[in-house]
C-alpha cells in the first residue's frame, strides 16, 4: 500500500491517509468520499456511455495503471465492480489486494471478475503483467461503451468475437 499511497496525487486514486500493522495484519485508512458504484452510474445512463463522456473518465485510469506498473504494482481487477464515481463525476479505482487473489490456483481464494479477467488469470502457470491490466481495462471500457460485458475469458478463447448491434458499432470511436 505504500507504493499505492505514492500515487495519492492521481485523480483516479482514493487517497490513502495512513498505513499501519496490528496483530500481524496490515491496514490502510482511506479518505472518506461519497461514491456511487460505477455499475449503478451506468444503469442511470441507459447502461452505457458515449465516448465523449467515457474518455475523460478513463484516461486518468490508464495513466494510473501505467504508473502502478512502473513501480512494480498491478491491480489486475479493473472491472465495473472496482470502479466508483464521485459526486463531481470523477472515476475512482478501488479493490487493491495481493496478486495471488487475482489468479486461480494459488493458496488464496481468487477474486476474478467474469468478462474482465484475462485468460492468464485462470491458469497458474502464467505470470500477470501489464497485458493482464490492459485486458481488464479494455473489457471494462467495452462494457461502458456498449452496455455488454464481454464473455468470460475461457469462452473467448474458443470464440473471440464480440457481437454487438450495428447501431452500437456506429457509435464507437
Q: How should these model regions be labeled?
A:
Residues 1-6:
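AlphaC helix of the eukaryotic protein kinase fold
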Residues 19:
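Activation-segment/catalytic-loop signature of the eukaryotic protein kinase fold
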Residues 23-37:
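Conserved short submotifs of the Hanks-type protein kinase catalytic core
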Residues 38-49:
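AlphaC helix of the protein kinase catalytic domain
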Residues 57-58:
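Activation segment signature within eukaryotic-like protein kinase domains
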Residues 61-73:
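Protein kinase catalytic-loop region centered on the HRD/HxD motif
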Residues 82-95:
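Conserved protein kinase catalytic/activation segment
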Residues 115-173:
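C-terminal lobe helix-coil module of Hanks-type protein kinase domains
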Amino acid at each position: 500500500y505504500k507504493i499505492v499511497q505514492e500515487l495519492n496525487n492521481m485523480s483516479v486514486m482514493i487517497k490513502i491517509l495512513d498505513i499501519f500493522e496490528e496483530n500481524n495484519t496490515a491496514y490502510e485508512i482511506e479518505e472518506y468520499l461519497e461514491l456511487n458504484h460505477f455499475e449503478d452510474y451506468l444503469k442511470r445512463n441507459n447502461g452505457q456511455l458515449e465516448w465523449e463522456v467515457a474518455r475523460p473518465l478513463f484516461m486518468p485510469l490508464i495513466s494510473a495503471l501505467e504508473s502502478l506498473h512502473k513501480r512494480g504494482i498491478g491491480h489486475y481487477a479493473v472491472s465495473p465492480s472496482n470502479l466508483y464515481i464521485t459526486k463531481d463525476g470523477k472515476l475512482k479505482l478501488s479493490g487493491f489486494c495481493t496478486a495471488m487473489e487475482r489468479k486461480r490456483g494459488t493458496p488464496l481464494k481468487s477474486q476474478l471478475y467474469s468478462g474482465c479477467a484475462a485468460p492468464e488469470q485462470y491458469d497458474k502457470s502464467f505470470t500477470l503483467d501489464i497485458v493482464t491490466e490492459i485486458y481488464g481495462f479494455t473489457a471494462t471500457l467495452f462494457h461502458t461503451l456498449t452496455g455488454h460485458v464481454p464473455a468470460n475469458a475461457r469462452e473467448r478463447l474458443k470464440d473471440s468475437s464480440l457481437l454487438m448491434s450495428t447501431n452500437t458499432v456506429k457509435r464507437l470511436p
